[in-house]
Amino acid sequence: MPLKTIDGIEYEVLTPAQVVVKKALINPLMNYVLPKSLVLYGINKSRSPLLKESILRPGGWRSMEISYENGPHVDWVDMLALKFSTFPMSLRNRRKLVARVICGLINHYAAAGHVNILGIGAGTGTNVMSGMAQSGKKNVSAHLIDLDSDAFEYGQGLCRKYGLHEDAVSFIEGDAVDIKSHIKVTPQIVKLVGIIEYLSDDEVRKLLAVSRDALPRGGSILSHSISRAHGVDRFTRRIFNLNLTYRSDTRVMELMGEAGFGDFRVRHEPLGVYSVIVGVKK
């Protein structure tokens, strides 16, 4: 796929011809024409790690990491899913953008002393650790909380891969609603990435309230919107049972505003699926 550099970030993009072919042919075929039984048969015959993991645990951390890593494809079906599907492409774009934004926030707060980052629903923590590595700052700690500790061992390996000291990253199994019982520091940055698209508005409000209470005045929250611009929402629902809650950047900012955040900054990845949003506690 072609690449496009925007503000120093190398993104995956589609050519105008590819956009037309996807909209006119590929997406309708996947969404409405191909029988579910035939698709599942093809996935079963394929050796694609991404597709098999998406069947077992749709939206789980393993399928995310497979998409992020973007390793060599194992067969032509895997190539189509991993290399040419807009969804994994946009996920990789989002990770790059989130890491860059986190890096910028670290640099902003590091001038005043030690920086603490709270990752909610953090999974492996790759977004946070990538941002930490990019910043090059040593006075940064990440506190990564998730209900499921399944991803933590993999995340510890990523910590070593990014060249971060193991004491700089803490993996915490628990519910973010009880965050004060899990961490004793005050974070300057809270990250809500890869979680709110699986939650209702009321559930998001609860996490935003927890985030607001954890942050000092002037602290930042980072989250994102998601749109159907990937073009295969119906396909992912009927094949993988992946039911996402789509919110525009405007809607996410409305929810953040209700929780007491403002001074919003929004950056978009070029495929139009994700926008990264930063708000500041008033």
Which residue ranges define each predicted feature?
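Helix-to-beta-strand junctions that scaffold the AdoMet/dcAdoMet cofactor pocket
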Residues: 199-200, 215-217
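Class I (Rossmann-like) S-adenosyl-L-methionine-dependent methyltransferase catalytic domain
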Residues: 2-37, 58, 62-65, 70-77, ...
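Short, surface-exposed "cap/lid" segments of acyl-processing enzymes
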Residues: 53-54
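A conserved beta-strand element that flanks and buttresses the S-adenosyl-L-methionine
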Residues: 191-194
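Conserved S-adenosyl-L-methionine
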Residues: 119-121
